[in-house]
Amino acid sequence: MHYFDIYDENFSKYRNKNITILEIGVFKGGSLSMWQKYFGPKVKIIGIDINEYCKRFEQENIKIYIGDQSNINFLDNVLADIDKPDIIIDDGGHSSNQQITSFNYLYEHLNYGGTYLVEDTHTSYASSKKFHDRLDKLTFVEYAKVLSDELNDWYRINSYKIYREPVNKANVSYWAKNIYKISFYNSIIAFEKRKNTIPFATIS
């Protein structure tokens, strides 16, 4: 499946709506123009890049911040200055530490009903050491697999106890309560954020 097909599958519901996109990795600005055309005139686009050159792509509805996506203080300053994002796209440095650090911090600030999409996850399998910069050697693909287990955290504890407790008191992880769906594609992983309710089974 081509990247554009994946974009449309995950983003079509946001077209022509008042939304904010946060894209990590501006490069030569091509994707910024693409998002303007795809989402329509109501979209606000926020770009993050480590290269000062990218500032030249700012326009009326496009703002660029220069900094390191794995720097929490930098990300915090960006978030304080923008509307809460509905879509976050990580097409940045592609190292495991950058992808995991950005995801862990930014996902919490994503609007409910929003989508977090990480591109070029094939770097998890690359031989180059520059992509494998974590002491624990964890790649983003492996981390996403862990999160797929977290998605089912409801079933790790006594199910009868879960069904008797309010969702906000259930002893399950943040990810179980806030990831509705994880979609694995060729070199892309997408997460949909929703407030999850306690799962139940109907016996017929």
Q: Over which residues does each language-model region extend?
A:
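A short alpha-helical cap/connector motif
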Residues: 1-89, 93-118, 122-204
